[in-house]
C-alpha cells in the first residue's frame, strides 16, 4: 500500500505542475511563482520559444506547413515575373501562283514567324569573345585577299596561267509566229578585242606573211581556218602578249586537223617550217617494193635474173660510150661526194625529225590548255568575221579561186 500511495502522490504533483504552467501569468510580475512541491515553474511564451510541452512530443512543425511555405514563396516570385509569351504559330497565306487570262490560280504558302528580334537574341547569346556583327563572308574574303597577295608575289617569280572561262549558254528568240515564240539555246562567244589584236599583230610577222603568200591555193589557210585560230586564242586562256609565231602555227595545224581530211595539207605546214624531210624517201621506196612484191608473187622468180640484166646493161652502156674507161677513174670521187651529201642530208633529217616531235608535243599542250574544246560552230566563225568585215584576211575564200 505504501508503494501505491507514493505513485498517486507523484502523479498528483505532475498534474499540478502541468496545470500551473498552463495558467496565464500577470504581466507586472517579474518572477514566476514557486509551487508548493518545491519544483520551479517555467514561463512559456508560444510566439517566441517553442519548448517541449510534454515528454515524447515532437516540437518540430509538421511537414505540411513547410511545403506550404515554399509554395507561397514560389507563388510570390512567379507573380513578380512577367508572364512568358508563347511563340505564335506560323500563319498561312494565299499567294498568286499563275495568271491565265481572267483566271487566277492561288497557292497556299506558310509565313515564317522568325522576326529580327530573334536574330538579336541569338547574337546576344553568343560567346563574349565572338563578334556577331561581321558575317562569315568577310572572313572568307580576308582569306581570299591573303591568297591574292601571295599569288601576286608568286607571279613575280613564275608567271601563272589563267584558265579561260567556259562559254555560257543563253536563250535567244529564233522565230516569232503570232503570239508564239520559239527559243533556241545559243552559246556566248568568249572572243574579246584583245584576241583580234593579238591575231593582227602576228599577221605582221615576216614568216607568217611568207607562209600566207606561199599557200596560194588556200589549202591550209582560208578564212574559216584563220577564224578558228582566233577562236582557239580565246579558249587557250593565255594573255594577248604571250601569243607568238609558234602559237599561230599550232592553232592553224589543229584547225586543219579538225576540218580537213587531207593529210598532205597538214604536212605542208611542216614542209614550210622545217623543209622537206628526204630521209623518209628510202623507207617509202622500201615499203613500196615490199607492197609490190606481196601483190606480185612471181617477183621471186625474176629476182635471179637481176644480176644478169645489170651486167648486160653495163656492157651495152660501155659499148655505146667508148669514154667510159676514162670516166671510170672519177667514180671514187663521185661516191665520196655522194656520201658527204647523204650524210649532210641525214643530219638535217635528224634535226627536222626532232623539231617535228617538239611541234607535236606543243600542239598537244595547246590542245589541253583549251580543255579539249577544239570544235567551233559556224555561228561563232561568222561572229569573228563580223568584228572587222573589211579585213584583208577574210578575202581568202576558196570559192573565189574557182
Curated annotation (Swiss-Prot):
Polar residues biased stretches: 16-39
Region called Disordered, residue ranges: 1-89
Domain of life per record: Eukaryota
Pfam families for the chain: Spy1 (PF11357)
GO MF, one example: protein kinase binding
Biased composition (Acidic residues): 76-89
Family in the record: Belongs to the Speedy/Ringo family.
Protein name in the entry: Speedy protein E5
Gene symbol of the encoding locus: SPDYE5
